[in-house]
Amino acid sequence: MAETTGRIPLWLIGTVTGIPVIGLVGIFFYGSYSGLGSSL
């Protein structure tokens, strides 16, 4: 883990893991706001 962290920039890991999380949270809030989240 230490070797891969040294080669791969930390901001790149944060971006790759952050975008899907933000997308899922956005879809979740959008669905609940539209009223579709309650049915799920």
Curated annotation (Swiss-Prot):
Cross-referenced Pfam families, in alphabetical order? PsbJ
Q: Which keywords does the record carry?
A: Chloroplast, Membrane, Photosynthesis, Photosystem II, Plastid, Reaction center, Thylakoid, Transmembrane, Transmembrane helix
UniProt topology in membrane? Single-pass membrane protein
What is stated as this protein's family in its record?
A: Belongs to the PsbJ family.
- Subunit notes for this chain? PSII is composed of 1 copy each of membrane proteins PsbA, PsbB, PsbC, PsbD, PsbE, PsbF, PsbH, PsbI, PsbJ, PsbK, PsbL, PsbM, PsbT, PsbX, PsbY, PsbZ, Psb30/Ycf12, at least 3 peripheral proteins of the oxygen-evolving complex and a large number of cofactors. It forms dimeric complexes.
**Highest taxon of source:** Eukaryota
GO terms under biological process: photosynthesis
Q: What does this protein do?
A: One of the components of the core complex of photosystem II (PSII). PSII is a light-driven water:plastoquinone oxidoreductase that uses light energy to abstract electrons from H(2)O, generating O(2) and a proton gradient subsequently used for ATP formation. It consists of a core antenna complex that captures photons, and an electron transfer chain that converts photonic excitation into a charge separation.
Name the record gives this protein: Photosystem II reaction center protein J
Query: What PANTHER family does its record include?
Result: PHOTOSYSTEM II REACTION CENTER PROTEIN J (PTHR34812:SF3)
Grouped into one coarse class, the protein's main location is plastid
Question: Where in the cell is the protein located?
Answer: Plastid, Chloroplast thylakoid membrane
Q: Which GO terms describe its cellular component?
A: chloroplast thylakoid membrane; photosystem II reaction center
Please name the InterPro entries in this protein's record: PSII_PsbJ, PSII_PsbJ_sf
NCBIfam families reported for this sequence: PRK02565.1 (NF002722)
Query: Which segments cross the bilayer?
Result: 8-28
